[in-house]
Amino acid sequence: LDAVERTLLRHALAALGEEERQIVLLHAVAGMKHREIAALLELPLATVLSKYHRALKKMRIILEGDDAR
């Protein structure tokens, strides 16, 4: 990623709630499986999965919005 892409990604991550951001980073950066994240955060697996997918959707909307400018 170049500097601009990293800035856009940080912006998209900052728009997420704390728990959503944590789940995305644990999965995408730390490489943890959703089941491991659920155990770590003491959340049901279904909750982790829904928060993860909701967070990705939010990030996609933000990033596509930045591309449209």
Regions inferred by a protein language model and the residue ranges of each:
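Short alpha-helical "packing" element that flanks the helix-turn-helix/winged-helix DNA-binding module
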Residues: 9, 23-24
